[in-house]
Each structure stands twice: as C-alpha cells, then as structure tokens.
C-alpha cells in the first residue's frame, strides 16, 4: 500500500482510480520511469512555494530535473509535476518549457526524450500550429514515439470545443471571400454553428 505523496494530493488521482491501482498493485509505482513535463514554467513565478519547498514537503521527488525554464510563467509545469508525483510517486520527473515558440517546443520534446523521459506530457496549444499536416511539434512527437516514448497532450482541455463534420468543397480555389449565400438545395460547405442567446466564442 502506498500513502498519498506530499502535503496535498490531486483529486484526479482518485478520479482516475490510480490510487486504487497502486493499492492493488503495490509493486507498480512508476519506479524506473522518467516522466517529462512541458508547460509554461517550473520555478520562476516568485510564489512562496518553490521547487525546493515542494521536494521538502514530498510534493515532488528529489529526482526532479529542470532542463529549461521560462521567466515570468505561472509554474503550471510544477503543478503538473505534482499531479504526476501523486499518481506515480516512484517516477523521476523532468521539465522543459514549451513557451518560447514552436521550434523550441519541438526541440524540448526531443531534449526530454534524449535525456531519458519515457512518458512525456504537455498542456500547451499554439494557435499557429498547422491543422492539416504535421508541423514541427507533431513531427517531434512522432520522432520520440518512434524511439519508444509515450506522449500525451492535454486534449481534454479543449476536447469539447472542436467541430467535426464531413468535408464539402466550396468549388473554389484560393481566396474566396465574401462567401456567397447558399441557394436552396445546395450542399452546405460552411460550418453550421448555432449560438445560444447571450453566448460568446473565440474562433481560431
């Protein structure tokens, strides 16, 4: 049986039943695995709690390593690492920032894998990522997965905010605004989105 790690334990540990899994399989606690975390920053927010205090309190493992950090962040990466430590208290944790551009995000994915991370997680979206082909971030993910790593992105953060439908061509090429109104019986090629009264949305 493994007790909770540190002063505070994430509710997610119980919600996903990883606490029950550790009880049922006490020899499996993440030992021998390094988890790589990508987010904004790890130890630069200026808050009273720091990486050092988190390690002292048992909220992070002593084996925590920071490959690169980002000045002025919220230390969300450290919060993610605390959750990882609750779920897999035996795992080592490694952090690299994803907040200095697409290329550096991609490079840090590879850097984490090269440094030994076998499980890598991120919670970062760039609106400029390509939608219909693999950009540098996706290519880096493909590379580390091909090398044996497992990669998880926080798709659940925006999982209900997408739109999926069968593609219908507009029949035009290139820039085609303003869009003409559809005639009766035409196959719709614009997205049928309905907003409730008083609702707002950001379309990207």
Task: Provide a role label for each language-model segment.
Residues 26-31, 86-88, 112-114, 144-146:
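Extracellular/periplasmic catalytic domains that process cell-envelope and extracellular macromolecules
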Residues 1-24, 109-111, 115-116, 123-142, ...:
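Autoinhibitory propeptides
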Residues 126-204:
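Substrate-binding/specificity loop regions of serine endopeptidase catalytic domains
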């Amino acid at each position: 049986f493994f007790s909770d790690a540190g002063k505070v334990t994430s509710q997610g540990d119980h919600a996903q039943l990883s606490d029950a899994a550790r009880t049922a399989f006490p020899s499996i606690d993440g030992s021998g695995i390094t988890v790589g975390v990508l987010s904004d920053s790890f130890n630069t927010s200026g808050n009273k709690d720091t990486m050092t205090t988190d390690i002292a309190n048992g909220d992070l493992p002593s084996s925590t390593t920071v490959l690169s950090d980002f000045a002025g962040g919220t230390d969300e990466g450290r919060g993610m690492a605390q959750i990882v430590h609750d779920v897999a208290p035996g795992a080592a944790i490694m952090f690299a920032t994803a907040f200095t551009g697409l290329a550096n995000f991609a490079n840090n994915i590879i850097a984490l894998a090269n440094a030994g991370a076998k499980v890598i997680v991120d919670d970062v979206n760039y609106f400029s990522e390509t939608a219909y082909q693999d950009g540098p971030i996706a290519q880096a993910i493909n590379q580390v997965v091909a090398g044996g790593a497992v990669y998880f992105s926080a798709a659940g953060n925006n999982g209900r905010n997408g739109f999926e439908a069968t593609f219908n061509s507009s029949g035009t090429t290139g820039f085609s605004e303003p869009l003409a109104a559809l005639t009766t019986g035409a196959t719709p090629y614009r997205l049928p989105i309905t907003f409730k009264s008083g609702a707002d949305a950001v379309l990207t």
